[in-house]
Amino acid sequence: ILATAIWVRDHNPDRFVALVTKDINLRMKSKAVGMVAQDYLTDRVEEVKVETSQKEVHFIDNAPAEVLQELAYSQNNAVDWRAVCHDRPYPNQLFKFKVQNEDTLCARYDADIDKILLVRKREACGIKPRNDEQKFAIDACLNKKIKLVSLTGGAGTGKTLLALASALEQERDYDQIILSRPTVILGNQDIGFLPGDQKNKMSPFLQPLMDNLNVIKAQYRPSSKEYQRLEALVKDEKLLITPLAYIRGRSLGNAYFIIDEAQNLTPHEIKTIITRAGE
């Protein structure tokens, strides 16, 4: 391949010739012999610089005492953003206000009312947040005005658990809760075909999702109504745990859709998932 690319370049001196490959080793060899090589960019997410205020929590440590008082104790727990910001915040932008004793007040900008609202500590299906970041996550997942929530964080930070607990907390408002993840093996190493039907084949991939469901169920006694309700959701397929491989062609209306391990998806797969959403 490399020799062919060099031949084409040498026989077309008036044209720009580059070797396009996703093989990084081949690109290194091309560079060593002076051949221009590029990565295949079509199936790759463009790295666009995101403004800091769009992706991080805005920390304010010098807010006036009267603003903190109004945010924490007023009837609507809301303050005018002009009291703490020079520029209008982005919709659903998150804030942390430093108060005494190293505590913080968590807040979120609501574009509908043009005010900054207090984010209270809420629990979802018995799961309580352990830090401010989890508090923000539950608040976003329980907010029906926010149609798309993206949770990022390290391993074991509770992303899937919080999303699933929030969905189960609102299960009466949706026709179906769909929990899915791509069938990607660690290290992308193929282990061959698995025996059994579709359910048996997908079981190893979907086990992490079942583990999160079992964490929620473990809070209740098997004889309790809550435990029986969760069991019924799975049995009646109102809570459906499924691989992403079978989502093409479906229309998901009035559904709470959770995608786990989304970083393993290609841009084409992300587009396919988004176009499945109904009203």
Range-by-range predicted roles:
Residues 156-158:
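Conserved glycine(s) of the Walker
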